[in-house]
UniProtKB/Swiss-Prot annotation:
UniProt pathway annotation: Amino-acid biosynthesis; L-proline biosynthesis; L-glutamate 5-semialdehyde from L-glutamate: step 2/2
High-level lineage: Bacteria, Pseudomonadati, Pseudomonadota, Gammaproteobacteria, Enterobacterales
Protein's recorded name: Gamma-glutamyl phosphate reductase
HAMAP family xref list: ProA (MF_00412)
Keyword Amino-acid biosynthesis: yes
One term of GO molecular function: NADP binding
EC nos: 1.2.1.41
GO cellular component: cytoplasm
Species of provenance: Sodalis glossinidius (strain morsitans)
Catalysed conversion reaction: L-glutamate 5-semialdehyde + phosphate + NADP(+) = L-glutamyl 5-phosphate + NADPH + H(+)
Biological process (GO), any one: L-proline biosynthetic process
Length: 417
């Protein structure tokens, strides 16, 4: 089955690679309209997935990721239209020069070819990735989690019909509908047809892909994100940023998981933090040094464990740890962080500059929420993933991250000297 999917995707990628920007944008517009016109079939499939997920005891954070409703589906269609408005990077000349030999040489952006994406209970990823791949002339093979297989199947059916209506190959977007995990291993070895693989899931999935894949892999999306509050910050300015980072969408990979606080402000700041987090229903997981300042506050406070520092909460839980100073905060982030998104809240220019230089994360913020790590917020449109590695892309992966380049040389019957 996967062999045939791979062959079909590769053939489709050759057709997509030569489409004009106008042709691709027209197809994306039809896809967006079709998603809205066929929303009920997608929502019905999602309702079945949600019911089964609840029966299987899926945790609230994952249920939130799985859920589609009319508003979320409309937002997904709007994201596709936003991709239409983005500049098509395919065909752009990155740089060029005329050499002494007389050869005119340039680097030009081209599609990758076929992209494979493995993800979990995120039905929006199906559309986001399909739109970005089509915009950049790539075919895509999707393998969503077993929790979303009905939703994904219904969504891909709508997309494929839209492609057919536009005279484009339906197999440009394919989904592995069988939830059998053995098919993941088979996909990892489909290097004859798939040019890049992106796993969007937990540490176990990333480890499996790194160890077993014969396809180049880009990993990311695991976000143990930190905010360090230093001793110069204005409390009234800091608390709303912390709230936004933790509460806006706790199940997101760019939400705050660990708050590091300079010990010099603990006595004044932590009681206020407790009151603020209590109103938001946040449970604080504090170290031995921080707990005495939180014990009398209204927010639920428990002892943090070593494992807590390594894991994503993806819920209304927040680790709180006191720091001796800047160096200890950076050391903590280096040890426990996942190189996703980390921030400092400070009024010190020197501290801000050091944090930017010394914290080796994909995205580093000064006086801003970690929630900004998002393709839409960065002006990239929808994102295919947030890469936490350094090759071939880093941070939110928009259109350019789904391209490579080729060297093109022009001569006049030129021979090498």
């Amino acid at each position: 089955m996967l062999e045939q999917m791979g062959k079909a995707a590769k053939a489709a990628s050759w057709q997509l690679a030569v489409l004009t920007s106008a042709q691709k944008d027209s197809a994306l517009q039809v896809i967006a309209d079709s998603l809205e016109a066929n929303s009920q079939s997608i929502l019905d499939a999602n309702a079945q997935d949600m019911a089964e997920a609840r029966r299987n005891g899926l945790v609230d954070a994952l249920l939130d990721r799985l859920l589609l409703n009319p508003a979320r589906l409309s937002a997904i269609a709007a994201d596709v239209r936003q991709v239409c408005r983005l500049t098509d990077p395919v065909g752009q000349v990155i740089d060029g020069q005329r050499l002494d030999s007389g050869l005119s040489l340039e680097r030009r952006r081209v599609p990758l070819g076929v992209v494979g994406v493995i993800y979990e209970a995120r039905p929006n990823v199906t559309v986001d990735v399909a739109a970005l791949c089509l915009k950049t002339g790539n075919a895509v093979i999707l393998r969503g989690g077993k929790e979303t297989y009905r939703t994904n199947a219904a969504t891909v059916k709508v997309i494929q019909q839209a492609l057919t209506d536009c005279g484009l190959p339906a197999c440009a977007v394919q989904a592995i509908e069988d939830p059998d995990r053995a098919l993941v291993n088979a996909l990892l070895r489909l290097d004859r047809y798939v040019d890049m693989l992106i796993p969007r899931g937990g540490a176990g999935l990333h480890k499996l892909c790194r160890e077993q894949s014969t396809i180049p892999v880009i990993t990311g999306g695991i976000g143990v994100c930190h905010i360090y509050v230093d001793d110069t910050i204005d409390f009234e300015q800091a608390l709303p940023v912390i709230e936004n980072a933790k509460i806006q969408r706790p199940s997101a990979c760019n939400s705050l998981e660990t708050l590091l606080v300079h010990q010099a402000i603990a006595e004044r700041f932590l009681p206020r933090l407790s009151h603020h987090m209590h109103t938001l229903g946040v449970t604080l997981h504090a170290d031995d040094n921080a707990r005495p300042y939180l014990a009398d506050g209204p927010a639920t406070c428990v002892a943090v464990t070593e494992a807590d520092y390594h894991d994503e909460w993806l819920s209304r839980d927040l680790n709180v740890k006191l720091m001796d100073g800047f160096e200890q905060a950076v050391a903590h982030i280096r040890h426990y962080g996942t190189q996703h998104s980390d921030a400092i809240l400070t009024r010190s220019i020197q501290a801000a500059d050091r944090f930017v230089r010394e914290v080796d994360s994909s995205v580093v913020y000064v006086n801003a929420s970690t929630r900004f790590t998002d393709g839409g917020q960065f002006g990239l449109g929808a994102e295919v993933a947030v890469s936490t590695q350094k090759l071939h892309a880093r941070g939110p992966m928009g259109l350019e991250a789904l391209t490579t380049y080729k060297w093109i040389g022009y001569g006049d019957n030129l021979s090498r000297p």
